[in-house]
Amino acid sequence: MGKTFAEKALGKAAGAPVSAGQVVIVEPHFCMSHDNAAPISKTFKKIGVSKVWKPDNLVFILDHAIPAPTDKHAENHMQVRAFVKEQGIRNFYDITSKGGVCHQIMCEEGFALPGLIMVGSDSHTCTYGAVSYTHLRAHETVLDLV
């Protein structure tokens, strides 16, 4: 039997053939987070790292609670904006005209392309499989370690 799409994409990223059930370590092409990037930025600082490793591989999109329905949401948005600026993250989609639904932006802006691998903090990252994009869902407390 031939390889699955996931086996092909992960094997390409790992530089060696992989099979179902095998544990492999690969570097994702992109990591995506949305409004929950505020807790990510807090955890990032707690682990004692001053700069993100590859800011151009990060995509932050504010799309879940916009406009901010509560003071807490507004505070989270401010924390995300501050973190993005501090870290030099250029792939930031705020609630302005550049913003939108995270999954739509990932596809329309060319982050979700066939054969690439992405780790996202949203439970619907599986939708990228529709465009042959390998996706892995990570809890926001894990995404800061990727």
Language-model region placement:
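Non-transmembrane, aqueous-exposed alpha-helical and coiled segments at domain scale
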Residues: Y93-V101, I105-G115
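Conserved small/polar residues in nucleotide/adenosyl-binding loops
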Residues: T134-T141
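Hydrophobic alpha-helical segments, chiefly the membrane-spanning helices
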Residues: L145-V146
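Active-site-proximal helix-loop elements at catalytic-domain edges
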Residues: P67-G99
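N-terminal low-complexity or amphipathic/hydrophobic leaders
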Residues: L10, A16-A74
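General beta-strand structural signal in soluble alpha/beta enzymes
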Residues: V26, F60-L62, N91-S97, M118-S121, ...
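Short active-site loop/helix that positions an aromatic residue
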Residues: Y128-Y133
